[in-house]
Amino acid sequence: TADLRRCGLVCGVNPSLGQVDYYAYGPWENYSDRKDGCMIGRYADTVEGMEVAYVKPQSMGNREGLRELKLTGIDGKGICIQTEGQVSFSALRYTDEDMMNCNHMWELKPRPYIVLHLDAAMRGVGNASCGQDVDTLPAYQVPQKELSYKLRFTSCTKE
């Protein structure tokens, strides 16, 4: 399908695993065409801290270049995901559909689970803020070809 927004895996995760530790571009949200101001490194946050308070809800909280992700509880126990290949991720309390169907952030109702996206490709943001509708450049669109990555899931405990 042409013009996909993202291509990858989405799953629900136990809501008690709200501590997020990752090795990727950060510490702010970033996209393929919006990551020059971010650095590869290890960052820690919470699922709620990954939200961005946009005027209108939309996809948010993406991190590019993921190599390792730990989702843990306050006791330090949880899941560890190591990656191989291009992977981006987001961990939120909302689905994409939830965000597309609301006009204001206060209308969003948190899901009873964490919505985890692990994507092989995520469409860039593009730019329509300059008075002209400028689409996402082809280099930052989801390619129409076979995409693959490897994910290794293990349990993790406090180090």
Regions found by a protein language model. Give the residues of each.
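Beta-strand/loop-rich accessory regions of lumenal/periplasmic or secreted enzymes
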Residues: 1-159
